[in-house]
Amino acid sequence: MRDVSRSIQAQFRGALGRFALDAAFTVPATGITGLFGPSGCGKSTVLRCIAGLQQLPGSTFAIDGDVWQDASQFRQPHQRPIGYVFQEASLFAHLSVKANLLYGAPRDAAHARDSITFDEVIELLGLAALLERSPRHLSGGERQRVAIGRALLSQPKLLLMDEPLSALDRLTKDEILPFLERLHERLALPVIYVSHDMAEIERLADHLVLMRKGQVLAAGPLAALQSDPALPLAASRDAAVNFEATVEDYDPGYGLLTVAVDGGRLLVPAPPAQRGEHRRLRIAAGDVSLARELPHNTSILNVLPARIVSHNPLGDSEILVVLALGGNGEGARLLARVTRRSWDHLELADGIGLIAQVKGVALAPGRNTGTHASSPGLRGR
């Protein structure tokens, strides 16, 4: 395997009973990488392979150039510096929350320069009030927060999360997601996050590995895979693209943020934020309409110059349009769904410049994408 620093390189190939796995990908060793696909496509199996719990001959894995396995070596699970969070918290019922958190933590971790400390984990995950309680008396969301804290205190080089919210109801998921976002904002620890819920992926992930039937369809930045018409995400009824945006201004009179994206500016209803802060936006294909000329007297606030990159038919009546923001067509990608009649009526074609009217912009709650640090400890330490 080629030694590439600051990247995760994986290639797992082999038969597991009747299931054939052929998964190869390279992603940055920073941020959150979502491993996404339908149930049974091999996502959890890939995590087990990364952890060394499943051994397939001839497979390879390396992170930051540190080879964990290849044709000549295989590091056992206990020798791999990973934290693993499962669907179920699996806490020790006879131990307190504090004892569960400290279980397995290296004794010399407090003296390591880049380690995350006990107090930092307590603060990040909001666990101070739970330390003396028994796991038996915790809610599902509290148990998962403790499990995440225990994984972090093992001082991992890589955090694996296998559908950590799948056993929780929607209300509890909404309670725990902000804590995961805080971890993303404050820690530089790479995470591989398995889910079949695209809403979780869109809210958390920076990069995406898209799987189907044991194979990797594509791997890359989240927005790039969302806007690729050759992949199933763009053709789905709820297709959308996520953007990283920078706050430029806030209008308290109307409660609107002005944010800059690659290729333009958007007005977003949102609470106040500081200039320079980063926010994640989501624009659904169904919330984008097209015009050949700048409209007048419209209620739509976000009207941006764009250029058609490509188009693909969706059945007999609709067309998926891939747009690039900005007059030069080199900005962020955006999706739109239009009827074939509208396409013909406007005489649209690839390469044409037009106006994209964005009727709705969703702001990820509490998400400040920040800047990624290089240390596994707290950002900016």
Curated annotation (Swiss-Prot):
Catalytic activity: molybdate(out) + ATP + H2O = molybdate(in) + ADP + phosphate + H(+)
Gene3D superfamilies linked: 2.40.50.100, P-loop containing nucleotide triphosphate hydrolases
Domain Mop: 297-367
Matches recorded under SMART domains: AAA (SM00382)
Primary subcellular site in the record, as a coarse category: membrane
Presence of keyword Cell membrane: yes
Recorded topology in the membrane: Peripheral membrane protein
GO cellular component, one term: plasma membrane
Protein localization: Cell inner membrane
InterPro entries cross-referenced by the UniProt entry: AAA+_ATPase (IPR003593), ABC_transporter-like_ATP-bd (IPR003439), ABC_transporter-like_CS (IPR017871), Mo/tungstate-bd_C_term_dom (IPR008995), ModC_ABC_ATP-bd (IPR011868), Molybdenum_import_ModC (IPR050334), Mop_domain (IPR004606), P-loop_NTPase (IPR027417)
Domain annotation ABC transporter: ranges: 5-238
Keyword entries, A-Z: ATP-binding, Cell inner membrane, Cell membrane, Membrane, Molybdenum, Nucleotide-binding, Translocase, Transport
Domain of life: Bacteria
GO molecular function: ABC-type molybdate transporter activity; ATP binding; ATP hydrolysis activity
EC number from the UniProt entry: 7.3.2.5
Binding positions for ATP per the UniProt entry: 37-44
Record NCBIfam families: modC_ABC
Record text on subunit structure and interactions: The complex is composed of two ATP-binding proteins (ModC), two transmembrane proteins (ModB) and a solute-binding protein (ModA).
Protein purpose: Part of the ABC transporter complex ModABC involved in molybdenum import. Responsible for energy coupling to the transport system.
UniProt cross-references to PANTHER family, sorted A to Z: ABC TRANSPORTER I FAMILY MEMBER 10, MOLYBDENUM IMPORT ATP-BINDING PROTEIN MODC 2
Family: Belongs to the ABC transporter superfamily. Molybdate importer (TC 3.A.1.8) family.
Protein name: Molybdenum import ATP-binding protein ModC
Species for this entry: Rhodopseudomonas palustris (strain BisB18)
Phylogenetic classification of the source organism: Bacteria, Pseudomonadati, Pseudomonadota, Alphaproteobacteria, Hyphomicrobiales
Gene: modC
